[in-house]
A protein has these predicted regions:
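Phosphopantetheine-dependent thiolation modules in NRPS/PKS and related acyl-activating systems
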Residues: 2-40, 46-52, 56-88
Length: 88
């Protein structure tokens, strides 16, 4: 996404889901309520790899203390949108 483009929750969520799909060897159902560890079986290294890809895609840095607020896919999209828009 271009930094100047208009982002919505739905567009951020869509990108996060696509990036999750790239990290999973087999197709997995991803919803807003999906938890990274329990539902999607990400370990800590997998989460950090995903975070790096998210940061690269959106050209944003996610502070480590934000990760505790990003337990589900929906929470991640919400926090990302706030970081990108500078509303947090």
């Amino acid at each position: 996404m271009s930094p100047g483009g208009e982002l919505s929750y739905a567009s951020v969520l869509s990108v996060v889901v696509a990036l999750i799909d790239e990290h999973k060897p087999e197709p997995v159902e991803v919803t807003e309520a999906s938890e990274f560890k329990s539902d999607l079986n990400f370990d800590s290294i997998g989460i950090m790899d995903l975070v790096a890809d998210i940061e690269d895609h959106f050209e944003v840095t996610i502070p480590l203390n934000e990760l505790s607020r990003m337990q589900t896919v929906g929470q991640t999209a919400t926090r990302l949108l706030a970081l990108i828009q500078g509303t947090d």
